[in-house]
From Swiss-Prot:
Single GO molecular function: protein phosphatase regulator activity
Pfam families in UniProt: SAPS
Biased composition range(s): Polar residues: 909-924
Regions of compositional bias (Acidic residues) in chain numbering: 171-182, 784-793, 828-838, 932-944, 1000-1018
Quaternary structure and interacting proteins, as annotated: Associates with the SIT4 protein phosphatase catalytic subunit in a cell-cycle-dependent manner.
Keyword NADP: no
Changes after translation: Hyperphosphorylated in the absence of SIT4.
Name assigned to this protein: SIT4-associating protein SAP190
Subcellular location: Cytoplasm
Predominant subcellular localization, coarse grouping: cytoplasm
Similarity comment text for this entry: Belongs to the SAPS family.
GO cellular component: cytosol; nucleus
Biased composition (Basic and acidic residues): 158-170, 183-195, 858-879
Length: 1033
């Protein structure tokens, strides 16, 4: 078995290299002697004495004694864990174990002796020493001791450090013994010659640094392995954890390998014993400061996020309280200042955004989310937002990271998606907790306050021109783009329901005060008093807050009363009455506490309403007022054409326009932003001018501006808004807004260019108009034309009122009447019909239950057709051929007697082949002839479900048979043409029957020769048409 892939051999008595090393890995503790002697040393000493006394006999017995000693040593090692208490580990073999390639495999296979050896505290301490080695932690040392490369030799770098070391080692060894040196040189020379013959590349010996790095990696793999005994042994010895966590005390930057080892080991311990690990982590001093020293290290910051994720609402661990007491959020915001490097700023910003995502308020996010907490509440507090805004105004990377944090806060803490809306809660029904959803009132108010500063930064930022293939352009820059993105997101935030509720701000402040008091009393032992005092400093007007609290408490008590009290006594009902009495005043005051929206056809956008909203603005309106005062929205809109190639900016501008045109019109300040967009900014004129500029530019250069796609989207928003106000019959008090829609140039643009563009956008990809029609349309149209064509030879056509029905047979509505089932005639006899209006017409395949009254007419044709149809079925059961010329002699009379308006070549549910010769030819036949395939008695399909494929001899698919005449409105109309309905039906049927006879006879003559040639193939072949099983017959 020399070529077998099994590398362990077939002899089970052969030990693995790891097991051989482990045989000498335990030293027995001898209490009688002062010195500890490894197992087997006594026997070796005795043997040595005997060898010294009798040299002649020793030469022949050395090998036998050594083998016996190894077996005895193996047998003397204990087999239970308790017996190893009398042994201590031999640390000299640890390096040999780490150098073995199969060590980790043996560990995963639960090698008993290996587990016992690795569980010793001395061994674990040595492994941690490998991981925390200064050579591993010191990145400069690693880089300084790298092999030198001779400059100027690019193709073949020469390694000179190893050569020098080899020379030194050879020189030192050369002074010991010449014979040993010569032998070793000779052996090494032979080995090198063999290696050179086998391969052209020889691996140099590992350096000391490489060996230590490899051993540190293996040690980290062992410590982080999914082996419970090792993890438990580490957790039992806190000193080992302390030495491991000393990595955080190393000055920055910390090498990535060392931080990776730290993260892997601690994550394993955290998963194994979360309680003990968190107890150790929270007991560490300056936890936040030690982690923020390495804020640039992603592995350490990811581990900190995992520690934070353990503090869930249903099982709190106290991590968030400890981190808040150590001021994690303020220190992270400090790292966003330009005083730190760009990488440090970006790392701090990324950590804050990841933490906000982890603390999302949405229940549809990842299961690992911890929900709102005190850290995120501190982040959106007035003090922290003010600090963040000042950092953002410094520009550069600070602005970019700050905008990213604000956007993440708004998107992950939308109050509209709260499980319980804040305005519907009370202190009694929902006492405030540290896990309450956070609100963004302070955020919106402070950004409205500093909006002029951001507007100045947007206007003053200028960048040098850039050379492009089509000319020099001015780049937008990250600062201006981030400001535009910030404005769009703040506009989203200002439309939240909580920020537009009159009592929303008061309720939020009341709950914040109550929550701060509870935290202050419950966390005195945890030194949270200072932070609570800082939080309480946000509210300066204590008297006003007490009055608000008392008033809201009375209002909430009244809300908890009976329904009669709610309707008569509460302040909300009184506000609703005020809304009905004075619509204009309430509309200006945002309908006070009720939020009732009045559906008035006139939109109040007068100056009096504007001033009324400015006197007592809500939080959401305060931001919109700041946007209007700074004219920042108009400045952003002008940038649409100034930067025609920046699609990111165009997308943001479209987002702003979409919010304005879809915002509330009857409440809030949004109507005035709309007026500024249409009247002051003259948006319609800008769109038309931009489209014309693009056309002129295209004529000169052959290129179109990059904003045309978003320009069309903005124009579509204006058109939809115009349709909305027309449909709702809304009018503006100020007619300037309505006049913009009635200007000639805008009407011409919307009716021509915009309409054509809309039609192109709405076209299905790959649709070529009316050039191609679907198969169903072709069949339906051909059927309708043939049916109308049949009426041309009908003598009853043109007699009067029923001509319109026949002439309009191609119309879709009349065709539906033609194909649908009619219940107007013989309702008592139509229960037995199983008829469908589409292709799967059951009467086409076979008659489930035929109505006897339809076949008992005086002419007798229906009954004869049924009898012939039954004969065809019986022939199929006897295994006749698929095509029979004898049956075709009377085929025309048999097939056309069922109805007069269903010619076989125009049957509505199945189209005929274009070549008449293919109609009676079975193209689905086997290449070889099979005997007995037509005999039903030879084979019975056990899986036949009644829908199996048809077999040869089935007459249903040689020539399509028409079902009995359906009861439709068309037939009823034809019957009403004459008082004698039966005679007219016979006459009409005869005219069409003659036509069918001629067509079928012509098809038979054309295909007669071809059928004779393929008679054998058709007789023995299979058809892919579906039919009922023979049990149905």
């Amino acid at each position: 078995m020399s070529g077998s892939f099994w590398k362990f051999g077939q002899d089970y008595s052969i030990e693995s290299p790891v097991s051989k090393i482990l045989n000498s890995a335990f030293i027995k503790i001898n209490k009688d002697q002062d010195d500890d002697v490894p197992t087997g040393t006594c026997e070796e000493n005795i043997a040595d004495d005997e060898d010294n006394s009798s040299h002649d006999y020793a030469a022949s017995e050395d090998n036998v004694v050594n083998e016996n000693e190894e077996k005895e040593e193996e047998n003397t090692l204990p087999t239970t864990e308790s017996e190893y208490e009398n042994y201590r580990p031999n640390l000299d073999v640890l390096d040999d174990l780490l150098d073995d390639d199969e060590l980790y495999t043996e560990l995963m296979c639960s090698n008993f002796k290996l587990l016992i050896f690795l569980k010793y505290p001395e061994v674990l301490s040595k492994l941690i020493e490998y991981v925390t080695n200064e050579k591993i932690l010191d990145e400069e040392t690693d880089s300084a001791k790298k092999p030198e490369i001779i400059e100027g030799v690019n193709d073949h770098p020469i390694l000179i450090e190893r050569d020098r070391k080899d020379k030194k080692e050879d020189a030192e060894e050369g002074g010991d013994s010449e014979e040993t040196t010569n032998d070793s040189d000779h052996d090494s020379g032979d080995e090198r010659s063999v290696d050179s013959e086998e391969t052209s590349i020889t691996l140099p010996p590992e350096s000391e640094e490489q060996v230590e790095t490899r051993r540190a990696r293996i040690a980290a793999e062992i410590l982080s392995a999914d082996v419970w005994p090792i993890s438990a042994a580490i957790m039992q010895n806190k000193d080992l954890l302390g030495r491991l966590w000393s990595i955080l005390d190393h000055p920055a930057p910390l090498p990535i390998p060392a931080s990776t080892y730290f993260m892997k080991i601690n994550e394993r311990l955290l998963d194994m014993d979360i309680t003990g690990m968190l107890e150790f982590i929270l007991s560490r001093d300056s936890l936040v400061a030690r982690f923020l020293t390495h804020v640039d290290n992603p592995s350490l910051m990811d581990f900190l996020l995992k520690v934070i994720s353990t503090d869930k609402p249903d099982s709190p661990t106290g991590v968030i309280k400890i981190l808040k007491s150590q001021e994690l959020i303020p220190k992270l915001l400090d790292h966003l200042n330009p005083e730190y490097g760009i990488s440090t700023q970006s790392a701090a910003g990324d950590f804050i955004k990841a933490f906000v995502t982890l603390s999302t308020n949405s229940s549809n996010e990842l299961a690992s989310g911890i929900g709102p907490n005190e850290l995120t509440r501190q982040l959106v507090s007035e003090e922290m937002i003010e600090k963040l805004i000042k950092i953002m105004l410094k520009g550069g990377t600070s602005l970019s990271n700050g905008v990213g944090i604000i956007i993440e806060l708004i998107r992950k803490n939308n109050s509209d998606y709260d499980f319980i809306q804040l305005v519907y809660t009370t202190l009694e029904s929902h006492p405030p907790t540290d896990r309450d959803p956070i609100h963004l009132i302070h955020l919106v108010k402070l950004f409205a306050k500093h909006m002029p500063d951001f507007a100045d930064m947007l206007d003053k930022t200028k960048l040098p021109l850039m050379e492009m293939p089509f000319g020099n352009i001015e780049p937008l820059g990250f600062e201006r783009f981030k400001i535009c993105e910030l404005i769009a997101e703040l506009l989203h935030c200002s439309n939240m329901t909580l920020l537009n509720e009159p009592n929303g701000e008061m309720i939020a402040q009341e709950r914040d005060i109550e929550r701060a008091k509870e935290l202050e009393t419950s966390t005195e032992k945890e030194n949270i008093t200072a932070i609570v005092d800082n939080k309480s400093s946000y509210y300066d007007k204590d008297c006003v807050e007490k009055d608000i609290t008392e008033n809201l408490g009375a209002l909430q008590i009244n809300n908890q009363g009976s329904e009669e009290d709610e309707l008569n006594d509460t302040g909300v009902s009184s506000v609703k009455l005020d809304v009905k009495s004075d619509a204009k005043v309430v509309e200006g005051l945002e309908n006070d506490a009720s939020g009732v929206e009045l559906y008035d056809e006139t939109l109040s956008d007068t100056e009096s309403v504007r001033e009324c909203l400015r006197e007592k603005p809500l939080v959401g309106d305060r931001l919109k007022i700041a946007l209007e005062d700074t004219k920042i929205l108009i400045s952003i809109l002008d940038m649409f054409t100034e930067f025609p190639w920046n699609n990111f900016l165009h997308n943001v501008i479209f987002d702003i326009a979409q919010q304005i045109f879809n915002g509330p019109l009857k409440t809030g300040y949004n109507r005035f932003l709309l007026k500024d967009y249409l009247v002051d900014a003259y948006l319609t004129k800008k769109i038309v001018d931009a489209d014309k500029a693009c056309q002129d530019y295209e004529k000169k250069t052959g290129l179109r501006h990059g904003y045309m796609g978003h320009l069309t989207l903005v124009a579509e928003e204006i058109s939809k808004f115009k349709e909305y106000i027309d449909e709702m019959k809304l009018t503006f008090c100020n007619t300037a807004v309505s006049d913009r829609f009635e200007e000639p140039f805008w009407k011409e643009y919307s009716e021509t260019i915009l309409a054509d563009t809309r039609e192109k956008y709405n076209t299905v990809l790959g649709d070529f108009g009316n050039d191609q029609e679907s198969d169903d349309d072709v069949i339906r149209n051909s059927d309708s034309e043939d049916i109308i064509g049949d009426t041309e030879g009908n003598e009853n056509y043109g007699n009067g009122e029923n001509d319109e029905l026949l002439s309009n047979g191609h119309d879709s509505g009349n065709m539906d009447l033609y194909y649908n089932f009619n219940n107007n005639e013989n309702e008592e006899n139509e229960e037995d019909y199983a008829e469908y209006s589409d292709v799967d017409n059951k009467n086409y395949y076979n008659n489930v239950e035929t109505n006897d009254d339809d076949y008992d007419s005086d002419d007798g044709k229906s009954k004869s057709a049924e009898s012939e149809f039954t004969d065809k079925i019986s022939e199929h059961r006897d295994g006749n051929s698929l095509y029979n010329e004898d049956n075709d002699e009377n085929g025309s009379d048999k097939w056309t007697s069922g109805t007069s308006l269903f010619p076989p070549d125009h049957f509505p549910s199945r189209s005929q082949p274009s070549d008449p010769k293919l109609q009676d030819q079975n193209i689905f036949h086997h290449q070889f002839d099979f005997e007995g395939v037509g005999d039903d008695d030879d084979y019975m399909d056990p899986n036949d479900d009644g829908q199996s494929y048809a077999r040869p001899g089935n007459p249903l698919y040689t020539t399509p048979k028409t079902p009995p005449r359906p009861k439709t409105i068309l037939f009823n109309s034809l019957s009403a043409l004459d008082n004698n309905g039966e005679d007219e039906e016979v006459a009409l049927g005869t005219s069409v029957d003659d036509r069918m006879d001629n067509e079928i006879s012509s098809d038979e003559e054309d295909s007669e020769d071809e059928d004779e040639e393929n008679d054998m193939g058709n007789e023995e072949g299979y058809s892919l048409y579906r039919s009922r099983s023979k049990e149905a017959f």
